[in-house]
Design a protein with these regions (language model features):
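Alpha-helical transmembrane segments used as membrane anchors
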Residues: 1-141
């Protein structure tokens, strides 16, 4: 009985944190930096913490495709809260994480190959660097 109650509370907590991350990612502005002056008005709807989270995950991580992480968090939270079977959700989460990685690296490769603009804004810095590694490793230029 106590374990069921803890899983419900944990599910609600995961949903709340995931919604916070989701709004942080949706309010991401590439022109905002966490190290800007305290006098500058922050436009992220979740404040300075949302700015830091979106900066780390979107700009320094795998880009805009990271919006799927809070979606998976909401699904996991609801599954724990409703005490449903999570066998299929494990497989969906694994495929989702693989999709995030591959899509970000593919976008990075596309921006490196076909664009003259900055190639880390949409795929993220990590996705772009991994794509750049593969371009250098597999090319003969």
């Amino acid at each position: 009985m106590a374990t069921d109650r803890r899983l419900e509370i944990f599910g609600i907590l995961i949903i709340a944190v995931s919604v916070f991350f989701l709004f942080s990612f949706l309010g991401y502005n590439p022109n905002e930096e966490p190290s800007i002056s305290p006098n500058v008005k922050i436009e992220n709807p979740m404040g300075i913490l949302g700015l830091i989270i979106s900066h780390v995950f979107v700009k320094l991580g795998f880009g805009y495709v990271m919006i799927f992480i809070p979606v998976f968090g909401i699904l996991w939270g609801w599954t724990l809260f409703a005490k449903k079977d999570y066998g299929n959700l494990i497989k969906i989460s694994q495929y989702g994480i693989l999709f995030i990685f591959l899509f970000s690296v593919t976008l990075g490769f596309t921006f490196i190959t076909f664009s003259t603009a900055s190639h880390y804004l949409i795929p993220g810095l990590l996705g772009s660097k991994i794509a750049y590694f593969f371009v250098n490793w597999l090319s003969e230029w």
